[in-house]
Structures are given as C-alpha cells and as structure tokens.
C-alpha cells in the first residue's frame, strides 16, 4: 500500500539579504513538521527556495554593482549552506528564475485565464518597496519633513500610478465556498485574529 503523502513549504525567500534568524526559524519549523510527518510514516515533500523577483532584489543587486541574475546566483550558496548547517532535510530547492518554475507559472496562469478567473485592470496605490506592500493613504504616517512614510518600517512610500494594465484574480468567484470551508474548518487559519481578518 502506498504511503500517504504530505507537503510542507517554506516561503520562498527574497535574496536581497543573506539568511538570518527569521528565515532560519521559519525553515526549522517547516523541517520539524516534515520530520514529524515522516516519523508517522508519511511520504513528505519539503520545498524551499529563493524568490528572485521584485524591486527589492533589483535594488540590492544595483547597490552591489551587479545585474539581478548575477546577484541571485551569488546568493544561492548562502541559502543552501545555511540549510545544510542546520540539517534541514528539504526535498526540493526552487528558484523562481529556473525554467521549470517559469513553465509551471505559465501553465497555471493559462488555466486561470481559460477558466475566466483573470481580468485586466489598473491599480493605483502607495507602495513601500521595503515591505512590498500597498497601503491606503489613510494608513500612512508623515515623517518630520511631512513626507508620507510606511507605518511599519517608516521608509518613504511611492505613489504607484500608471496606465499600465495588470491582471487580477477574481477572488469574488470563490468567496462563498471559501467562507463555507473556513466555517467548517475553523482551525484552518490560525491564529483566530488572522482568520477573522480574512473572513471580514
């Protein structure tokens, strides 16, 4: 009889900095769950890796006088060596610049498009590159110079407004099925404060 399968993933870590206590903590937690499930006889896959896209990565590469791909390539050993030093037993290490990742994303997007779950639109908002988050103007703070800053990291934010079209996911198509699922499985999103945030 085949073993029951179980999947564990870490975030795919941004390569704007070397692994640190936060990345180690998260990866150790994922590895602990993996070992526990393996000890219970399951066939477990633990996937980790690097997210090599984003403005933060491009800015960090430029700060080091490197092209983004060269910077990302230089960071891979730091992550692999850190996980080896911590005896992390991952089964796959994914890089978002790998051809296999690009192909998977293209296939996934095509399925969403074919099912009508994507639509084009424009987005405008205040963006913090460091936090990689958009904020409503009412959520921002002003620094001593009167400039709008991120409420979390206190760095300046940028108004991202362009006529550029973006693709959006029709989450509204799934609203009721998701709410029904969360009601039937109240422990699916933890802690409760995060569940309440999602369902409100």
State the predicted function of each range.
Residues 1-200:
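N-terminal, positively charged nucleic-acid-binding surface of large information/translation enzymes
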